[in-house]
Amino acid sequence: MAGLMSCSQKPEQMIMTVNGPVPASQVGITLTHEHVLVDFIGADSAGYHRWEKQEVVKKVLPYLAEIQEYKVTTLVECTPAYLGRDPWILKELSSETGMHLITNTGYYGAHNNLFIPEHFSNMSAREISEIWVDEFENGIEESGVKPGFIKIGVDGHDTLSKEHVKIITAAALTHQQTGLVIASHTGPDRPAFEQISVLQSHDVDPSCFIWVHAQRGSLEGNIRAANMGVWISLDNVNLNIEEGSEYDVRWYADRINELKNAGYLNKVLISHDAGWYKPEEADGGTFRGFSGIFTALIPALEQKGLSTEEIHLLLEVNPRNAFFLRN
């Protein structure tokens, strides 16, 4: 579309990690939607006082070590501010493991705005974007850590509310200033295309948008969005889902194969939406690991005939093409 910001990758593009920018070509095998810690208490009570950092690090390290056995080098941590984002923990985990971790800026409006801070209601989209841009330019609080993407969320059961239009507008304005890709907790087709429309109205190309939880959308919707350039994030690979049920591993293999057959494998991102340390539970509660893609989904895709090159596309090429800085 004429006038839209170009988001085609160029040589030596960079990706912002918790330790600073790295060449996109060096990020390697990447899990694009995971969580280290999530705190569902709500924005009015959220804060670092809710957890002990070293306990979180101790809990999470073995799960990162496990995926390093599968040569995973990068993990995109999708927990937003006011939901348990902790850049200090992510930086320490990166230091302990040598992995690239990527955090985010943005606000999460899903669940009826429970995780949006009080100041949001009295601020314009431009003013909200200035907060997010400041995190990118100067770091998150005093951590020195800069976000590598914009993470927002909208409710998927209805048309976008005015609050959620403000969130996606703020994301568009932030993208224009920073070049960060926008990943939005979305789900079904309708909110996905409504958000794409808002982005286009602000001259943001659809290829700068990740449709998070796109498995909740229709195949037709996934194909239509991919044709526009949108990234299709199939991101809840979960071995705890009973075989034969919707969204089991076979379902994911089928959806990925269908997108391949439609010509859009190069727009697919895969992950687990797994983890995570829960501050309200003893020892952080039950932690779901990050290895199911390697133990179950990749073998299922290989059975469907996906080649080594196509697996490489899903695990390495697509993530770096999605998360590079567009500036």
Predicted feature residues:
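Short acidic/histidine-rich active-site segments
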Residues: A183, D235, Y264-F287
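Active-site gating/metal-coordination segments in enzymes
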Residues: E92-S95, H100-I102, G106-T178, W231, ...
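Alpha-helical scaffold segments that flank or form the walls of functional sites
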Residues: G28-T32, L37, S45-H100, R126-V145
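Catalytic pocket-lining loop regions of alpha/beta-barrel enzymes
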Residues: Q176-K260, V268
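Divalent metal-coordination and catalytic microenvironments
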Residues: H33, L75, H175, I232, ...
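Mid-to-C-terminal alpha-helical segments outside catalytic/metal-binding sites
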Residues: L4, P11-G20, S291-N327
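Acidic/histidine-rich helix-loop elements
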Residues: V36-E55, L114-S121, D158, I241-G244, ...
